[in-house]
Regions:
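N-terminal capping/lid subdomain adjacent to the active-site entrance of alpha/beta enzymes
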Residues: 1-191, 196-205, 209-213, 237, ...
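Active-site pocket-lining/capping segments in soluble small-molecule metabolic enzymes
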Residues: 299-341, 345-346, 354-356
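Intrinsically disordered, low-complexity coil segments
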Residues: 71-86, 251-266, 320
């Protein structure tokens, strides 16, 4: 089976409400839909949506590289196994520094390979993949009252974990927001927070100690990404579990995060396929973390439905599902890149049973 054509379609996703994070915010996401068509007209889908602040290339580099590969890979034999996909991508060294481009191309290749194998992508990645995954709700409101209403609505929809962005305002204001959420959802619902690396070590320790009565599930990236020593120290200074997010984005840091001479620096690692270069590198990292007793879960990078669907298959294929994945973000966009075949319901995503990603060959923007 050979590749007949690689198509690229640019898209823009506009957020209904700008999502504030410490130091910046997001109003829109721009990316490329990657479509591979083989010589029997079978279609595989991928998505490349760079996130430069997490260490990916920019959109111009993504576009240039994938356009170049569209010509180079024309009529190239298509891989049949995950190992074959890895081998093909390894033969393209220019993808090493372009994780978003690699993710988009890898997804489309895996989609085709899984379809030919007659397996849903999750089962193609792991024979023991689960049929469904738990997901968290990302809350986007700013004011305590609005945040509480949003949290309560999420719980009524069946979510058991909610996530709140913090550190974009003074600690006392964040405390009021989180107290409002806890009062709204009760004690049984888990609350995780994300500081996006905006606190100093001292600020993080003060904040997490002060917030301890709220029994937070975890804190994502409390200190800057490069400060691994502070992440490790915080694990012993506070009761709240510490998750490495941006810190995982840089390839040279992953060995230090998990295999440093003093052991792992965080309790949990966050797996963003768009940042890590695809599903296969993310799956390897999850298995490595699992062997070391480090937790992990999969999140989107505010991606479109194709990337989120691939990430959901990954979340079903990783060894454990102890932590809810952060993939319930489609409702944040005014319009997605197309219909979502498996939107969250009752706090879970049920994976498609069709071979591959689970998108029809004529899937398109609606």
């Amino acid at each position: 089976m050979n590749l007949r054509e690689l198509q690229l379609r640019p898209f823009r996703l506009t957020l209904r409400t700008p999502l504030q994070r410490a130091g910046s915010g997001h109003r829109e996401r721009n990316g490329l839909l990657v479509t591979l068509i083989d010589d029997e007209s079978q279609v595989g889908y991928g998505e490349a949506t760079p996130l430069v602040e997490f260490g990916t290339e920019d959109l111009a580099a993504t576009t240039s590289l994938l356009n170049e590969l569209a010509h180079r890979l024309a009529h190239h034999p298509l891989p049949l196994t995950g190992e074959d996909v890895e081998e093909l991508l390894a033969s393209l060294p220019e993808l090493t520094d372009a994780p978003a481009a690699r993710c988009g191309l890898e997804s489309a290749l895996l989609d085709l390979a899984a379809q030919r194998a007659g397996l849903p992508l999750a089962k193609f990645l792991s024979a023991s993949a689960r049929a469904s995954i738990p997901v968290s709700a990302l809350l986007s409101a700013s004011e305590p009252e609005d945040l509480a209403r949003e949290a309560l609505a999420s719980i009524r929809e069946g979510f058991r974990v909610v996530k709140v962005k913090v550190a974009a305002r003074i600690l006392s204001d964040d405390a009021k927001r989180l107290i409002a959420v806890r009062r709204a959802v009760g004690d049984e619902v888990k609350i995780r927070i994300d500081a996006n690396g905006a606190w100093t070590e001292s600020e993080a320790a003060t904040a997490l100690r002060g917030l301890s009565p709220l029994k937070l599930e975890l804190c994502e990236q409390p200190v800057p990404a490069a400060n691994h020593a502070a992440l490790r120290r915080l694990r012993w200074q506070v009761r709240c579990p510490i998750a490495a997010d941006e810190s995982v984005s840089f390839p040279g840091a992953r060995d230090l995060l998990l295999d440093g001479e003093d052991g792992p620096v965080a309790d949990v690692v966050v797996l963003k396929p768009m940042v890590l270069g695809g599903l296969l590198p993310s799956l390897r990292l999850a298995r490595r973390a699992d062997a070391l007793g480090v937790g992990y879960y999969v999140t989107s990078s505010l991606d479109g439905v194709v990337a989120r669907l691939g990430a959901a298959h990954l979340a079903a294929a990783v060894p454990k599902a102890d932590w809810a994945s952060g993939l319930a973000v489609g409702q944040l966009f005014e319009k997605d890149t197309g219909l979502d075949p498996c939107p969250p319901r009752q706090g879970e995503i049920q994976l498609p049973v069709q071979p591959g990603l689970g998108l029809a060959a004529n899937w398109s923007r609606t």
